[in-house]
Amino acid sequence: MFTWAMKKIFGTSHERAIRRMRPRVEAIGRMEPELQKLSDAQLRAKTAEFKEKLANGATLDDILVPAFAVCREASKRALKMRHYDVQLIGGMVLHNGCIAEMRTGEGKTLVATLPCYLNALEGKGVHVVTVNDYLARRDAEWMGKLYGFLGLSTGVVVNQQGDAEKRHAYRCDITYGQNNEFGFDYLRDNMKFSALEYAQRPLHYAIVDEVDSILIDEARTPLIISGQGERSSDKYRTINEVIPQLRNEEHYALDEKAHSVTLTDEGVETAERLLASLQVLKGTNLYDPVNLETLHILNQCLRAHTLYKRDVNYMVRDGKVLIIDEFTGRVLAGRRWSDGLHQAVEAKENVRIQEESRTMATITFQNLFRLYKKLSGMTGTADTEAAEFHSTYKLDCVIIPTNKPVVRKDYEDLVYKTEKEKFTAVINEILEKHELGQPILVGTTSVEKSTAISRILAKRGVKHNVLNAKHHENEAYVVAQAGRKGAITVSTNMAGRGTDIILGGNAEMLAKLKFKEQNRQPEAEPEAFEALVEEIKKECTAEGDEIREIGGLYILGTERHESRRIDNQLRGRAGRQGDPGTSKFYLSLEDDLMRIFAGDRVKNLMERMGMPDDEPIEHPWVTKSVENAQKKVEERNFDIRKNLLEYDDVMSAQRKTIYDMRQSLLVGRYSPEILDEEGKPTGEKRTIKPLASIVELVRPDVGYLLGMFANDPVMPLDADGNRREIVRKDFEKTERFVELENMQREIYTRWGVKIELETRADKVLEIYDECSELMPLALTEQRERLLDLMDRIIGAMVEESCPARKPPEDWDWGGIFQGFREHFSVELPDDIAHIGDQETLARELYERAEKAYEKREEEIGVELSLRIFRHLYLEELDKAWVDHLTDMDHLRDGIGLRGYGQKDPKQEYKKEGYNMFVNMVARVSSNVVTKLFSVNVRRAEQEEAQIEAADRERHAAALLDAVAQHDESLPLGANPAPARPQPAVMQEQECPCGSGKPFNKCHGGEDEATA
C-alpha cells in the first residue's frame, strides 16, 4: 500500500529517469532551427568540431545535446526520418549504459544512431550487435547513409568474410554484426600468432539489439572453436540400439520439469545385459572406471530419445541434424550440442555421425559482453528480466514511453481440456477473421505445431504463408505481406524480430519482391523501383485504412511459451505506432507448460465447474495461474543461468589471464606488478628502464628503417655522430613522408614489438623519437619477462628441494643439482651445497642462471634469443591451454559427485580449478626455459629460419589482404602508386641508419652475411 502511494506521488523509477532527461530533449529541440540553416558541408564539419572538443578534454556528456541535435538533423537529410522526442530519450538511456525497453514499431534501429554517433566520436569503435546476418547487413547499409553523411565510417561483420574484410570492418567507427561473429572473432584473435593479424580492437562500447534474446535466452550457449577429437562414432550407433528396449518408469525416470532423465536400478541391470550382448561392456559393472565412456554415451543416447524431439528441438535436413532455437524458432546454422549429445541425436536419427571434437577456445555470451567497457541494449521486452540484467550485467532497464498511445486489446486466455478441441477452435477463429479480411498472425512454439496448422488450412483450401525453420528463406517478404488484408501467417517465434508488420503491407519490400519475381535489380533501375514503391504505397495505405476499421492485426497464440517475454514479443507484433490490434491465446491442458506446471490446478477448476470438453474456460484467474507457472519457469531458468555463470566465472578469470599473457607476448610488452613481502600483487607496476646495450643495438636501426620506408629515401651522409640530427637534416631537404604501416610491420617482424605510431606520417622526428624510446624499452621488457620466469623456476626449485622446516643437511641437494642442470644446461659446483639458508641459495642460483643466459645471448644474439623465447612461449602456452580446457571439462563433469561427500561442488571446482591452472602455468614456464637453454647455435639458426618462414608467410598473406583491400578502394581508372626500389649504397658510404659507421661495417655487413 505504501509503495503504491509513493509511486502515485513520485512516479515509477522509469518515469523519474525520463523526467530527468526532459530538459536535454528540450535543449536539443531548441537547436533545431539553427541547424536547419546549415549547409550539408557545415553540418558534416560539426563532427570534426566535436572530436576536437573531446581531444581538448571535454566529455561525451558535455557534447551530448549538440551531437544528438546534429544527428537528428542529418537523419532528416540522409534518411528522410526525424527522431521523435521519445527516441531522443531512448538514445540517452543507451548512452548511459542502460537497457531501453521500447515497444514494437517505435524505431529502435533509428534510436541506436544517436549513441552510436556520439560514442564513435572517441575513435575507439562502437559495435551494434544484432540477432542475425540479415539485420546486420540491412542496418549497416540503411544507417550507414546517415553515418557517411556525418563523415563516419560503417562496417559489417558477417560469416564467411576474410581476415582483411574483418579487419577493415572493425577499424570502422561503427561496426554492425551478428552476436556469434563478435564472439568467434574474439576467440580467433586470441588464437593468432601475430598481433598484426588481430581483427578486433579493444572492446569498448556495444549496443545489443534484442538484448533479452542475446543476453538472457542465449546466455547458457557457449561459443566453442573446436579441433578434431577422438573417434567414437561407431560406439554411439551400437549403444543407441539399447534405448528402444528401455521403458519409462520401469527402466528410467523422466523429469520433464527439470529436463533430466536417469536410469533406475532395474534399468542399469537391463542396460548391462544388453550392452554385454553387443560386446560393448567390459566386465559386468557399468559403473566400473573402464566403462565410463560407455556409461556417458548411454546417458546421452537416453537423453536424445526422451528429452529431444524432432521438429521441436531439432530438425533433419540433407542428412544433418540441425538445432532449432527454442526462443526464435530459427535453425542455428553451424551449431552442435556438446559433450556427445549431438552424436547421440545423430545415432537416433540414423544419419552420419560426425566425430567428436576437442575444445580449442570457448566463451559464453555472458562473459563476452561483460568484457566491454560500456554496454547497453534495447528490446521490446526487458522489464520481466530486469533483476537478472542488473545482477549479471549491472544493466538497469528504463521503459521508454510510446510516441502514440497503445490501443491494442489483449484478451484473457482460452483454455480447453484437450489439444484436439483447442486446434478445432483455432482453425474456426482463423477462418472467421479471414472472412472479415482481418490479417492474422498465428504464433506456435515449434515447427511441428506450425506444420500441423498449415496442413489443416491447406486441406480447407485456405491460402496462407508459413514461417518456420523449414520455410525461412523469404522471411522478410513473408513478414512484409503479413499486414495485408485477409493475410494468414503461421509462424514459430521467429516471426520477423527486427521487421515491423505494417498494416496494408510494406510497400518497399513488396516492390523488391515484384522485382525479384521479374529477375530485376532495384540498384540497376532506381527510378523504376522508386516509381513502383510509390504506386504500391498508395495501394497499401488504402488497404491499411480498411484494416484499421476492422480491428487491425489479430495475434492468435496457440500455446504459451515458458517465458512471458516471448509471449509479449508475439503480442507486440500488433498495435505499432497507435494502430489498433487484438491478441488472444488458445491453450489446452495437454500443452507442455500447462501439463508440467499448471495443469492440475486448472483441470480441477474446470471439473468443479462441470465444463464439457469442447467448452473453454476464460477467466482472469486462469490467465493468472498460467503467468504464475511462467514465473516459476523463469525463476528456475534464472537460477540455472546464475549457477552456470558462477562455474564459468572460474574459467573466465583463467581465460583472461591466459589471453592477457598471450597478447602481451605478441605485442612485445611486459609490465608486471610489484609484489609485497608475502608475494601478493600490490597494484603498482614495476618500472623497467631500457638497457644501455639494447639501446645501442636498436637505435641505429631506427634511422635505417626511416630511410628505408620514406616515400623518397636518400642516404644521410652527415658524420657528426648525432643520429637524431642526421635524421633531421636529411628529412628537411625535401618534403617526405614515412610509410608507417610498412615500417610498423618491419619492426614487428624483426623485433616482435608492436608500436602504434599515432603521429602523422610527415612528423619524422616524432616518429624517430617514439621508436628510439619504445623499441629498446619493449625489448628490455621482453628480456625481463624471461628473467622473471627463471626467477620463479628457481624459487619453486628451492622451495621444493630445500624446505625451511628442514635443516640444510637434510635438503635434497641432488634435486637442486639435477633441476638446475635440466633447466639451464649448466653444472653447479659442489660448494653450492655449503650454503645454509634459502634466500642466499636462491640468489646464488639466480645469478648463475642469469650469467648462463647472458652467455647464450652472446652466442646467438639478443634479437634471436628473444624471438626464440617468444616462439617457444606461445607454442607451449597454446598447447597447455587446450589440454587445460579438456581437463576442466572433465573436472566439471564429475564435480557434482563431491556433494555426496558433504562438500560444496562449486567451492571444490573453484579450488581444484585454481590449483590445476597454477600447475599448468608453472609447467609452461618450466618447459619454455628448459627448451630455450637447450637450443644450441646451430639449432638456433634452424629455429630462426622456421620463425622467419612463418613470419614471411603471414607477412605475404597480410600484403595480399592489403592489396585486395586497397584495390577495392581505388577509384575507377586510378593507378596504384609505383613501388620504389631502395637506392643502392656504396660499401664505403655511411650507413643510412645514422650510426656514423661505414655501410659495410654496419647494416651492409648484415646483408652480406645473409646473402
Curated annotation (Swiss-Prot):
<keyword id="KW-0997">Cell inner membrane</keyword>
<keyword id="KW-0479">Metal-binding</keyword>
<dbReference type="Pfam" id="PF21090">
    <property type="entry name" value="P-loop_SecA"/>
</dbReference>
<dbReference type="InterPro" id="IPR011116">
    <property type="entry name" value="SecA_Wing/Scaffold"/>
</dbReference>
<feature type="binding site">
    <location>
        <position position="993"/>
    </location>
    <ligand>
        <name>Zn(2+)</name>
    </ligand>
</feature>
<dbReference type="GO" id="GO:0031522">
    <property type="term" value="C:cell envelope Sec protein transport complex"/>
</dbReference>
<dbReference type="GO" id="GO:0065002">
    <property type="term" value="P:intracellular protein transmembrane transport"/>
</dbReference>
<feature type="binding site">
    <location>
        <position position="500"/>
    </location>
    <ligand>
        <name>ATP</name>
    </ligand>
</feature>
<dbReference type="InterPro" id="IPR011130">
    <property type="entry name" value="SecA_preprotein_X-link_dom"/>
</dbReference>
<dbReference type="InterPro" id="IPR027417">
    <property type="entry name" value="P-loop_NTPase"/>
</dbReference>
<feature type="binding site">
    <location>
        <position position="1003"/>
    </location>
    <ligand>
        <name>Zn(2+)</name>
    </ligand>
</feature>
<dbReference type="InterPro" id="IPR000185">
    <property type="entry name" value="SecA"/>
</dbReference>
<keyword id="KW-0963">Cytoplasm</keyword>
<keyword id="KW-0547">Nucleotide-binding</keyword>
<feature type="binding site">
    <location>
        <position position="87"/>
    </location>
    <ligand>
        <name>ATP</name>
    </ligand>
</feature>
<keyword id="KW-0067">ATP-binding</keyword>
<dbReference type="InterPro" id="IPR014018">
    <property type="entry name" value="SecA_motor_DEAD"/>
</dbReference>
<dbReference type="GO" id="GO:0005524">
    <property type="term" value="F:ATP binding"/>
</dbReference>
<dbReference type="GO" id="GO:0005829">
    <property type="term" value="C:cytosol"/>
</dbReference>
<keyword id="KW-0472">Membrane</keyword>
<keyword id="KW-0862">Zinc</keyword>
<dbReference type="InterPro" id="IPR001650">
    <property type="entry name" value="Helicase_C-like"/>
</dbReference>
<keyword id="KW-0811">Translocation</keyword>
<keyword id="KW-1003">Cell membrane</keyword>
<dbReference type="InterPro" id="IPR036266">
    <property type="entry name" value="SecA_Wing/Scaffold_sf"/>
</dbReference>
<feature type="binding site">
    <location>
        <position position="1002"/>
    </location>
    <ligand>
        <name>Zn(2+)</name>
    </ligand>
</feature>
<feature type="binding site">
    <location>
        <position position="991"/>
    </location>
    <ligand>
        <name>Zn(2+)</name>
    </ligand>
</feature>
<feature type="region of interest" description="Disordered">
    <location>
        <begin position="969"/>
        <end position="1011"/>
    </location>
</feature>
<dbReference type="GO" id="GO:0043952">
    <property type="term" value="P:protein transport by the Sec complex"/>
</dbReference>
<protein>
    <recommendedName>
        <fullName>Protein translocase subunit SecA</fullName>
        <ecNumber>7.4.2.8</ecNumber>
    </recommendedName>
</protein>
<comment type="function">
    <text>Part of the Sec protein translocase complex. Interacts with the SecYEG preprotein conducting channel. Has a central role in coupling the hydrolysis of ATP to the transfer of proteins into and across the cell membrane, serving as an ATP-driven molecular motor driving the stepwise translocation of polypeptide chains across the membrane.</text>
</comment>
<dbReference type="InterPro" id="IPR014001">
    <property type="entry name" value="Helicase_ATP-bd"/>
</dbReference>
<dbReference type="InterPro" id="IPR044722">
    <property type="entry name" value="SecA_SF2_C"/>
</dbReference>
<dbReference type="InterPro" id="IPR036670">
    <property type="entry name" value="SecA_X-link_sf"/>
</dbReference>
<keyword id="KW-0653">Protein transport</keyword>
<dbReference type="Pfam" id="PF07517">
    <property type="entry name" value="SecA_DEAD"/>
</dbReference>
<feature type="binding site">
    <location>
        <begin position="105"/>
        <end position="109"/>
    </location>
    <ligand>
        <name>ATP</name>
    </ligand>
</feature>
<dbReference type="GO" id="GO:0017038">
    <property type="term" value="P:protein import"/>
</dbReference>
<dbReference type="GO" id="GO:0008564">
    <property type="term" value="F:protein-exporting ATPase activity"/>
</dbReference>
<dbReference type="InterPro" id="IPR020937">
    <property type="entry name" value="SecA_CS"/>
</dbReference>
<comment type="subunit">
    <text>Monomer and homodimer. Part of the essential Sec protein translocation apparatus which comprises SecA, SecYEG and auxiliary proteins SecDF-YajC and YidC.</text>
</comment>
<dbReference type="Pfam" id="PF07516">
    <property type="entry name" value="SecA_SW"/>
</dbReference>
